[in-house]
Amino acid sequence: NVRLGAMLNLTFLSRNGNHKYQLKNIFNQLATSRYTWREGVDAQSNDEHSAEYSYRSRTTYNGQLTGKHTFTSDALDWSIGYAYANRHLPDRRRYLLNDIQNPGEIALHTGNDISREWTQLDEHIVSLGANDKHSFSFGSWQPSLQMGGYGEYRTRTYNTRAFYYQWNPSICTLPSDFQQGDVTRLLSDEANMGYDRLYMFEQMQMRNNYRAHNLMGAGYAAVDLPLGKLGVHAGVRFEHNDMELISNSRDTEKSESSRHYRTNDFFPSLNTTYKFNDRHQMRFSYGRSINRPEFREVSPSVYYDFDLASDVQGNTELRSCYIDNIDLRYEFYPSRGESISLAAFYKHFDSPIEWTYTVAGGTNLIYSYKNAQSANNYGLELDIRKNLGFIGLPDFSWSFNGALIKSRVEFAKGSKEENRPMQGQSPYLVNTGFFYKNAKQQLDIALLYNRIGKRIIGVGRSEGSAASDDNARVPHSYEMPRNTIDLSVSKKWGEHWELKLSVRDLLAERVYYKQFA
């Protein structure tokens, strides 16, 4: 991996300090070159050896011009933004060897077992937002009113081209010496290339290309009401969102058709805080939010994921998921920089979007996205931040965050699916860390530990036939628990120089995915 980053921030402040302008720019370039070799058994129970050579290039840029203005009773801020991102995979090469013809004999069988692919994704985002907070004064009572708006236009283009190696069209089957030969030597020898030997042809797949646009406009109003020991913040937000997907209906020619996904929604929110004293308080909050499908999730485009050994395809019938959140939290602040909080939470999901996989074309697996009917998550969360000065370590601190979650996806009566935990949701989460901060030496060190419980990463089919057909039963795929430890060190010299060192996943434990029949 190679990462290149650059940042430029400029600030202008008026003489009276009431007007502040900032220009923020951040640029990142990430390049990843990877070779992967895999041995195992495929979905058809054939022994398989396969390899992937890939180079991935990702570019991101984010620029924003902001302004903040303070008046007698108002605080106004605004922003204008532009963002760009691309992802290029030039010449991703894959080949496949298996024993489908002769059990126990690993070999190439057709030129289609060797492929080369070029993909390119480009995305542009333009945004505009403004907010105003007006403070009222009625004697000792000082409520405030906040209003604002936001607009965003996002556009994306995605194109891919796939090529395969074929043998002499009049014969088609590879000669035996090629079937058993080394693939890299086979392709690097120019004597093997020609119209009557190995040649490369393009498989037209126009349905895998798409263009997309998304226009979102929003406005909100909120009030802050101080009522003695009770503080209330309540508001409502309206959002209009129009996503357009333009894709091809045929593979061999440009045949674009457009589909819109429009939503108009109100999202209420309520946050209340009751302060018993300066060290103890209770919070209650409610909010409604939305999880809209991404472009790739509604696109009919098919992409082969080598890590999954399966195709990945979007779902054009995908719907937005609406989420209602309720949180009750008690907070205790023993001293400055220390806190203990205990929360009970509940989340209701209407039409949650889940990552699923199923059988296609007999025995091939394909991953996609699907709406479940509904889901409920509820649980407890404990958060602790503690300085270790009481044991003679004043520069050290400890943090802990843990949660227990009960998750349940509900299906309609008579459905062939069984109630289960929501895809991607772990029954428990543990995050803890030790921190060292020496202000005099300008040195910071952090050691972090993380563990998540067993969770479904691919939803299968609970009921179905035992045969190898499109109605076959497919067990859920689980990601098993895994421990990770990260280390980061930061050292500053004066006000302008800083060196950071980060090491991720020190334990490097294996990642296990399992199915339970």
What residues fall within each predicted segment?
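Signature of Gram-negative outer-membrane beta-barrel scaffolds
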Residues: 30-31, 115, 126, 131-279, ...
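Transmembrane beta-strands of outer-membrane beta-barrel pores
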Residues: 27-31, 71, 82-88, 120, ...
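Outer-membrane beta-barrel signature, preferentially recognizing the C-terminal barrel domain
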Residues: 48-66, 204-217, 290-349, 360-387, ...
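Short loop/turn motifs that connect adjacent beta-strands in outer-membrane beta-barrel proteins
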Residues: 15-20, 72-75, 135-144, 160, ...
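C-terminal beta-signal and adjacent terminal beta-strands/loops
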Residues: 350, 451-468, 490-517
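Transmembrane beta-barrel wall of Gram-negative outer-membrane proteins
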Residues: 1-35, 58-65, 72, 268-270
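Gram-negative outer-membrane beta-barrel transporters
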Residues: 345-349, 366-459
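Transmembrane beta-strands of outer-membrane beta-barrel proteins
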Residues: 19-23, 76-80, 143-149, 232-236, ...
